[in-house]
């Protein structure tokens, strides 16, 4: 189902991934199907990219966009003032209710509110007319879902019986989503699909194109002469009954995916099943393998580390600890590939290693379309395959480590509180140019590499999904109001600290690790999610301090390198 097709209801679903047992002929057919499907996708993108360019160049489109821009500029202040006025009135009502007083709105406020409401209504009516004109143009140039299906069917027929109608339509929906994001969402441009990044094809139902047979444990793919049937491997042991429970569900549709390995692509079957994910059960005791605990858990997550505080345990851990080793290997291979490319294409680079612009390249370095002709050695091609394999291994390891950590946290409590972080903003480079006292320009880098390697947002989404599925609660506290990293429960005030200051000092001189202390405060968040309960903080702090000291001693005794953001030094 398309992301933009809001009319079609989708129930809760889960995915079971199983390896395929195929011959060399089957592998060749699968490779051919994926290549053709990717070509069809790029053909559709190319067609609609031209349609989009043609539409946006018309005078009617430009006039409509200009009118919309002017309309938003004219009424922006009124819309903002109305929203602020409503918030202010709601706050006054709440304060009056607390003081058990009757709330009255002054005549001046009433007149101002009526004026703003009339302005906003006028704005909405004008906007509606302009958007109707815009949508009519979009429909006229063939940007409806049906038009995408129709155009894709033309490409499908030209490739014979390799790709079924359901698979082709699903590819068309993915392209439609891309253009919908550009026309209605935050999308800026459309990119073509490289074959190395085209990793999945799927049907719309289990009865056509890609069909799974539960009784024979086989999957059928393709049409007529290109039809292949492959056996699906099942875990015969299945100690926790996960696969058995999953296969008892109704299959909504099937998906064939491919993964990069050092010796080439391997293909797998993904079954999209009805209902929530099965739970793993210990066969000896009959209890849940990862059961949920009781109590509050506070989390303070950073680009590389995770601090947690529960009733019986506190801790500070590095996120996805083993991922950095894979990243080091990726960096080494990228360096080798870069040197190989420079040696094989000397005319493409300047003496200092910069890429030469196209307009300054000799004719033999460009093809008939004006694109660069890169010479790739056999060793370079092998390194490309190895690099894809390493990225796949790194992603799988990262997800495995995140899931293992979430299972550990799940046993600590059933109420989770975490700061609402904006990872996209943290990953961006700084806009302002800063200099040292000596005039040297400081680096604009922030946390882009750490966030890409450790994927803290993915960890939180996995944790939230597991907590909610297990019947617990997952709350996001208001970071800019709570200010956990600056707050002190002793004074009840905020004291701004430098980023390099990794320890919080108490009135008696005792020091606590900054992230662990923040997790402790987050654990004791009030119901409004923007302040802390000082009474429970004072009550639970002595027990927390003992657990904190134990955790610091454990970290200091470890014989490994830790992120500098932890502020932990090895014991002498």
Question: What are the functions of these language-model segments?
Answer:
Residues 2-167, 345, 349-362, 375, ...:
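Long, compositionally biased intrinsically disordered regions
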Residues 4-5, 267-572:
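Positively charged, helix-rich recognition surfaces that bind polyanionic ligands
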Residues 14-20, 226-236, 314-317:
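Generic detection of short hydrophobic beta-strand segments and adjacent strand-loop junctions
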Residues 57-70, 189-209, 353-362, 485, ...:
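Amphipathic alpha-helical surface "interface" segments used
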Residues 68-262, 448-449, 453:
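Acidic carboxylate diad motif detector
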């Amino acid at each position: 189902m398309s992301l933009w097709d809001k009319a079609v209801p989708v129930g809760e679903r889960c995915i079971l991934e199983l390896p395929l047992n195929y011959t060399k002929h089957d592998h060749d057919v699968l490779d051919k199907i994926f290549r053709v499907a990717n070509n069809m996708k790029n053909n559709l993108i190319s067609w609609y990219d031209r349609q989009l360019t043609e539409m946006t160049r018309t005078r009617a489109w430009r006039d409509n966009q200009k009118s919309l821009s002017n309309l938003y500029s004219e009424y922006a202040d009124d819309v903002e003032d109305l929203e602020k006025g409503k918030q202010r009135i709601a706050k006054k009502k709440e304060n009056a209710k607390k003081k058990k007083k009757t709330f009255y709105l002054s005549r001046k406020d009433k007149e101002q509110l009526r004026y703003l409401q009339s302005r906003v209504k006028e704005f909405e009516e004008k906007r509606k007319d302009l958007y109707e004109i815009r949508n009519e143009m979009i429909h006229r140039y063939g940007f409806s879902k049906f038009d995408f299906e129709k155009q894709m069917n033309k490409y499908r027929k030209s490739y014979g019986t390799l790709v079924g109608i359901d698979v082709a339509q699903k590819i068309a929906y993915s392209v439609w989503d891309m253009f919908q994001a550009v026309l209605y969402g935050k999308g800026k441009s459309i990119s073509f699909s490289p074959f190395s990044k085209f990793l999945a094809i799927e049907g719309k139902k289990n009865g056509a194109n890609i069909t799974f047979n539960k009784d024979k444990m086989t999957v059928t793919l393709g049409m007529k002469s290109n039809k292949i049937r492959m056996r699906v491997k099942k875990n015969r042991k299945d100690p926790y009954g996960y696969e058995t429970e999953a296969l008892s569900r109704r299959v909504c549709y099937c998906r064939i995916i491919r993964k990069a390995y050092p010796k080439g692509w391997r293909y797998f079957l993904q079954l999209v099943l009805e209902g929530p994910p099965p739970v793993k059960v210990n066969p000896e005791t009959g209890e849940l393998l990862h059961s949920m605990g009781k109590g509050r858990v506070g989390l303070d997550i950073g680009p590389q580390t995770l601090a947690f505080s529960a009733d019986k345990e506190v801790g500070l851990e590095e996120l996805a600890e083993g991922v950095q080793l894979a990243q080091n290997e990726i960096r080494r291979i990228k360096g080798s590939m870069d040197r190989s490319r420079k040696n094989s294409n000397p005319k493409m680079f300047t003496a200092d290693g910069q890429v030469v612009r196209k307009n300054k390249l000799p004719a033999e370095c460009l093809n008939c379309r004006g694109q660069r002709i890169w010479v790739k050695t056999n060793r370079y091609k092998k390194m490309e395959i190895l690099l894809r394999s390493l990225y796949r291994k790194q992603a799988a390891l990262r997800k495995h480590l995140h899931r293992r950590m979430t299972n550990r946290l799940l046993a600590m409590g059933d109420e989770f509180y975490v700061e609402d972080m904006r990872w996209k903003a943290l990953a961006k480079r700084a806009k302002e140019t800063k200099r040292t006292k000596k005039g040297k320009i400081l680096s604009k880098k922030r946390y882009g590499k750490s966030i890409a390697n450790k994927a803290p947002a993915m960890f939180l989404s996995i944790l939230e999904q597991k907590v909610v599925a297990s019947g617990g609660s997952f709350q996001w506290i208001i970071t800019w109001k709570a200010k956990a990293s600056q707050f002190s429960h002793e004074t009840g005030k905020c004291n701004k600290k430098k980023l390099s200051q990794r320890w919080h000092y108490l009135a008696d001189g005792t020091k606590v690790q900054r992230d662990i202390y923040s997790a402790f405060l987050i654990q004791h968040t009030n119901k409004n999610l923007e302040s802390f309960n000082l009474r429970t903080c004072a009550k639970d702090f002595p027990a927390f301090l003992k657990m904190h000291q134990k955790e610091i001693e454990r970290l200091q005794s470890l014989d490994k390198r830790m992120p500098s953001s932890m502020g932990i030094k090895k014991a002498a």
